[in-house]
Amino acid sequence: MRTNSLSFRLIFTSAVVAIVLLVSAAFLLAYLFQSAVERNFDARLRAILDGLLANVELGTDGAPGMEGQIADPRFSIPLSGWYWQVSPPKDKALGELASESSLEKRLVPTDADLKARDVGGVASFYILDSEGKELRAIEQKFNLFGGEDEFSFLVAGNFDELKEEVQAFRRALYGVLALLGFGLLASILLQV
């Protein structure tokens, strides 16, 4: 087949268009799946944050205290990758609360992590714990009833657990789209 023939140009352009579209679809679908997983994970963290808010009250000294417990047992397992903490403003020494799982180690988000907030004032970001686990965290500031100070409520979950599912989806997606690509190329070659 000559490179300047009509059939060669038709095969070549069809193959290039098919490959570009399949690669674009692969990246777009992988991104959309990752975004959906993050939104779902953030919604779970938000539900835990709401439960935490319902259980924290100010003491007579102005320090926060826990009235009940968080129902999820992962927050009691040491260094599980599931943490919550309630911190006072940086200029106040009111004491802070944290989950048993943190073992006195606190998560310290950067100012950049806390800068971007959604409409509800929630910052969502990734952070590493002391064990090197990648965590998905949300943070929101609240004024507790009866107090003037704005406390930082942070809840974080082990995102490494979900990364394996995301990777499995990507492998399956890339495999299926590669097979589809080979099928399209074969059909283009057979038709021309």
Regions found by a protein language model. Name each.
Residues 55, 59-62, 147, 172, ...:
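Generic macromolecular interface patches on structured domains
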